[in-house]
């Protein structure tokens, strides 16, 4: 059961469990998703875990982490509806499992403090050599992402589908914006984040309330009174279906279909939609997999996913370009069959078992536990895993039929070969 403590400038969330020998700390900086700041926030996430005043180089920091029994430190950015989140994750062995006493938790928290308040920087800028190196690395990573045609085509679909809305903003920003960022500009924005971002820290492991006092002594931020609007971003920018076909030198075409839905985490039909999605395309023996791939051999892979923050369901498939129209038609037919109730209790039971197993897997991974709890916290949903599974179990055949009636195809993006 989560315990939440109001700390100086942040909320501390404890997720006590004796499942793990490690202590996982996940610090989240969240602010409004804005096209003007995503590139800065992404580059900032690259900078924050590269060094501190005490350990200014990557090598020195790595050596220190190794001396802390292989402590791990990493950062990334994600979007959730109208939020852009910088995650800083630290994982270290629980000191209770050491043969002698050593205050690892305090050092783990102190390192987070140093990242923010004793960075490898002057009064006005990060270390210039490190800044240029991480900026170059980020640009190279985004170029590599474009070479990943699954990732590229999905990003392009969201760009078209969400033009002018949060859905259309890439969580990483674009290459040209990143190239324009200057060191002093990024450092100034870093100071803004420390002051204005809403901060949440999650701790997973065999911990008790004594850790609260360690946080009190080692980490504090300026009090933040920022108020954010709802995290949900259910914004539709047009009425008609948008179909985009792009040609590149690819051997396998990438099909992406974006649907609008009206179900979010707090909606009473959320659980029914989770079960529907599993049956339709979210599990290995889904309708889409069995019919489009196995029966008709029209794709190399196919699946559907549900984004409750943006009100979107997405179908992704790898196909031959020549099979585009036939594949789209077959997908539409499978959705129509679901809407007509052409599924049975075995399908429902299989989906519920898959969801249950997925939740069990989540509880076996500390950062997955954090992700689930964070989703609940930012949507103000008071629910345990047991309550969630009980509501999944209570979903009926009719609930599933009802929830899929108002699914609307919004955007199709196909990336195919030049000669197809």
Segments (PLM) and residue ranges:
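Short, polar/flexible loop-turn hinges at active-site or ligand-entry regions and domain interfaces
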Residues: 51-54, 96-99, 118-127
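Active-site glycine-rich loop that binds ribose-phosphate moieties when present
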Residues: 178-188
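Short, low-order "capping/linker" segments at domain edges
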Residues: 140-144, 240-254, 356-366
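Glycine-rich, mobile lid/loop segments that gate access to catalytic sites or pores
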Residues: 144-146, 161
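M16 family metallopeptidases and their MPP-like homologs
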Residues: 13-15, 21-33, 39, 58-114, ...
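Short proline/glycine- and acidic-rich turn/helix-capping motifs at secondary-structure junctions
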Residues: 129, 230-240, 346-357
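Sec-exported extracytoplasmic/periplasmic mature domains
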Residues: 117-121, 136, 143, 191, ...
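His/Glu-rich zincin catalytic helix
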Residues: 1-68, 172-174, 187-291, 411-420
């Amino acid at each position: 059961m989560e315990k939440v403590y109001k700390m100086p400038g942040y909320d501390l969330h404890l997720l006590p469990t004796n499942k793990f020998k490690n202590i996982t700390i996940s610090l989240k900086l969240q602010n409004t998703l804005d096209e003007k700041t995503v590139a800065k926030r992404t580059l900032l996430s690259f900078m924050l875990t590269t060094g501190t005043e005490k350990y200014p180089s990557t090598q020195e920091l790595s050596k220190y982490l190794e001396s802390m029994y292989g402590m791990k430190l990493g950062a990334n950015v994600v979007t959730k509806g109208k939020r852009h989140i910088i995650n800083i994750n630290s994982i270290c062995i629980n000191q209770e499992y050491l043969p002698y006493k050593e205050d690892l938790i305090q050092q783990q928290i102190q390192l987070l403090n140093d990242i923010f308040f004793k960075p490898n920087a002057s009064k006005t800028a990060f270390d210039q050599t490190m800044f240029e190196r991480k900026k170059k690395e980020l640009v190279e990573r985004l170029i590599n992402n474009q070479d990943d045609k699954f990732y590229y085509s999905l990003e392009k679909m969201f760009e078209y589908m969400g033009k002018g809305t949060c859905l259309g903003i890439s969580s990483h920003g674009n290459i040209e914006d990143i190239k324009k960022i200057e060191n002093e500009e990024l450092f100034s924005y870093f100071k803004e984040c420390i002051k204005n971002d809403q901060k949440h820290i999650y701790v997973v492991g065999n911990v008790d309330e004594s850790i609260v006092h360690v946080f009190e002594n080692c980490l504090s931020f300026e009090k933040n009174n920022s108020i954010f609007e709802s995290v949900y971003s259910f914004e539709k920018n047009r009425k008609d279906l948008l179909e985009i076909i792009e040609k590149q030198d690819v051997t396998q075409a990438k099909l992406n279909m974006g649907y609008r839905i009206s179900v979010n985490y707090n909606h009473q039909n959320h659980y029914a939609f989770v079960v529907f999605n599993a049956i339709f395309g979210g599990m290995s023996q889904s309708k889409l997999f069995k019919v489009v791939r196995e029966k008709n051999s029209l794709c190399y892979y196919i699946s559907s996913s549900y984004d409750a923050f943006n009100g979107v369901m997405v179908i992704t498939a790898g196909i031959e370009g020549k099979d585009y129209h036939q594949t789209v038609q077959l997908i539409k037919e499978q959705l129509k069959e679901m809407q007509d109730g052409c599924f049975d209790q075995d399908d429902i039971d299989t989906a519920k078992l898959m969801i249950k197993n997925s939740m069990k897997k989540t509880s076996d991974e500390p950062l997955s536990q954090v992700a689930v709890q964070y989703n609940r916290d930012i949507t103000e949903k008071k629910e345990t895993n047991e309550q969630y599974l009980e509501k999944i179990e209570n979903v009926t055949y009719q609930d599933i039929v009802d929830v899929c009636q108002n699914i609307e195809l919004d955007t199709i993006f196909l990336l195919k070969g030049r000669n197809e």
